[in-house]
Design a protein with these regions (language model features):
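Alpha-helical transmembrane segments and their helix-start/interface "positive-inside/aromatic belt" motifs
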Residues: 2-17, 82-90, 119, 124
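Pore-domain transmembrane helices of cation channels
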Residues: 103-143
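Pore domain of cation channels
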Residues: 166-170, 180-219
Length: 219
């Protein structure tokens, strides 16, 4: 039996990226649980505690199954079998976690904290989560479309054969410029994702600056 041709979706790289994203998301939640005592607002502390409790419950009951699932995906990749559905499940889960963490981070930015260490650490942990998540989304959707003779993204350079690095590069640039640079969306779906990604980053920067000004003025 001949091995399957190499997929442009590169399942091995995709799996490594998504596992890294889930790792940072888990560290974010664990750090949130350790710092709940620093949240001075009672309602905000209750919300944070609820999500942390949901996280610990999920980890306690589903972590063994998730580990087995990831090992199964690795085995399929090693055998050269098609496992894109498994990669997509991990990607969708990371997307859900990314948006939940985004909501929690906004909660921290808008709440009164007894110390600033928790907020700073959570901001740092969120950056790789959102970058890896949106980089994977851009890569998965555009490459899937190109395999069907279409495209969702037009790159300024080397548009015929973009590499995985190109997608994560435009996701990283969004951290600094609030919109993907060096590429443009050619479909409503991708344009919507570009806008959502940019708005999320702009929201965090605006709230962070507002919080910094408030602290500097003694508010």
């Amino acid at each position: 039996m001949q091995p399957m041709p190499k997929s442009p979706l590169r399942p091995g790289i995709a799996l490594a990226v998504l596992v890294a994203g889930h790792f940072f998301a888990s560290v974010f939640m664990r750090n949130l649980g350790a710092g709940i005592g620093e949240i001075a607002d009672p309602w905000a502390a209750k919300i944070a505690k609820f999500f942390y409790s949901a996280f610990t419950f999920t980890v306690g009951h589903l972590a063994p199954f998730m580990a087995i699932f990831i090992l199964f995906v690795i085995y399929r990749i090693w055998r050269g079998k098609n496992i894109q559905w498994g990669i997509d499940i991990l990607g969708v889960l990371l997307t859900v976690r990314c948006f939940v963490i985004f909501v929690l981070l906004n909660l921290l930015l808008l709440s009164q904290l007894r110390a600033g260490g928790l907020l700073l650490m959570q901001l740092i942990l969120f950056l790789p989560v959102i970058t890896l998540n949106f980089g994977w989304l851009y890569w998965r959707l555009d490459t899937g479309a190109r395999m069907k003779g279409q495209r969702h993204i037009r790159f300024a350079e080397d548009d015929e054969s973009p590499s995985p690095f190109d997608y994560f590069y435009i996701a990283t640039r969004t951290l600094l410029q609030f919109e993907p640079t060096g590429a443009s969306g050619t479909s409503r779906l991708m344009k919507a994702l570009f806008v959502i990604h940019g708005v999320m980053m702009l929201d965090l920067v605006a709230l962070t600056l507002s919080r910094a000004i408030s602290l500097a003025s003694g508010g």
